[in-house]
């Protein structure tokens, strides 16, 4: 989260979002990079195009009677003033969850009926859930996730080629030494290097199947917390995470690196205890971009 968002005078919700989004250097860099339209960029755009779309005008799971409430919520949050192609819907489901779905023109934020009807839910907690999902959509987390995967895959292919080359080199040297000097070599130094590269390839490939990264989840949490903090209700997002509880974690069991509710609460508690913390990385990138 850009430090500029924290300095917006309360309460000006649309100005908060403008400051948070316009000063996000990593997102700005991605938008610039994706325009290169080379191998990794084309792969990311192709995968985004292949994702299923959500059609609010046709989807029968949407609770139509709650649409006015959803539209008002976006107005109260200042999101409706931003001019982004996004919408909010309550959808029928037995799962307590909130999610962001891509639409033809932008994205839709959805909250399930199971979650919306949970004990303890307040208007501000719903705002927190929406802010979290809005961050995923507005910061282009889907596309950035695909782009990171595409670049990582190319890195792995390069490392795989290096590993294969080292294998061939080690075998060639061993054969050469044995033939020329009658001294077989073990190739231990090469083996160690090859083993490290091979291990890196396996781990990084397994961890980068499509899903929000831990960093993206924490970033979306921070956006939600900072937004509610801006309106004087920061603790409510943490309460919202508590309401999600372990049942929410169970939905993401297949993602071994998806942060648990407990770890997300701990992260925000740390943020609460250290208000002096700033986004040094974002500030550094901004300085680099704006320097002549």
What do these predicted ranges mean?
Residues 153-174:
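Hydrophobic alpha-helical membrane-anchor/signal-helix detector
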Residues 167-236:
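Metalloprotease/metallohydrolase-associated module, dominated by Zn2+-dependent proteases
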Residues 221, 238-241, 265:
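Conserved positions within tetratricopeptide repeat
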Residues 3-157, 226-233, 240, 246-255, ...:
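Peri-catalytic and regulatory segments of divalent metal-dependent proteins
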Residues 111, 220, 260:
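Residue-level signature of catalytic and energy-coupling elements of molecular machines
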Residues 250-273:
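Catalytic and substrate-binding regions of cell-wall glycan-acting enzymes that process beta-1,4-linked
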């Amino acid at each position: 989260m850009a430090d500029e968002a924290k300095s917006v005078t309360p309460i000006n919700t649309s100005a908060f979002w403008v400051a948070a989004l316009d000063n996000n250097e990593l997102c700005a860099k991605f938008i610039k990079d994706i325009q290169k339209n080379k191998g990794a960029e084309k792969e990311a755009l192709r995968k985004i195009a292949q994702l299923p779309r959500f059609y609010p005008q046709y989807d029968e799971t949407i609770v139509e009677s709650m649409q006015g409430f959803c539209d008002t919520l976006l107005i109260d949050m200042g999101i409706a003033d931003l001019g982004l192609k996004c919408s909010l819907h309550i959808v029928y489901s037995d799962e307590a969850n909130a999610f962001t779905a891509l639409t033809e023109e932008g994205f839709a934020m959805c909250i399930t009926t199971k979650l919306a009807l949970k004990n303890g839910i307040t208007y501000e907690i719903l705002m927190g859930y929406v802010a979290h999902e809005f961050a995923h959509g507005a910061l282009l987390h889907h596309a950035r996730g695909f782009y990171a995967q595409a670049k990582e895959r190319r890195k792995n292919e390069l490392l795989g080629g290096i590993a294969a080359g080292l294998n061939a080199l080690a075998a060639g040297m061993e054969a050469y030494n044995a033939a020329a000097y009658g001294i077989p070599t073990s190739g231990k130094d090469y083996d160690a290097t090859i083993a490290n590269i091979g291990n890196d390839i396996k781990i990084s490939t397994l961890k980068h199947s499509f899903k929000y990264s831990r960093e993206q989840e924490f970033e979306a949490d921070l956006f939600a917390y900072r937004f509610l903090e801006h309106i004087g209700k920061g603790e409510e997002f943490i309460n919202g995470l508590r309401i999600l509880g372990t049942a929410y974690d169970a939905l993401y069991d297949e993602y071994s690196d998806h942060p648990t509710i407990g770890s997300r609460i701990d992260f925000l508690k740390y943020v609460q205890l250290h208000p002096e913390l700033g986004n040094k990385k974002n500030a550094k990138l901004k300085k680099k971009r704006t320097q002549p």
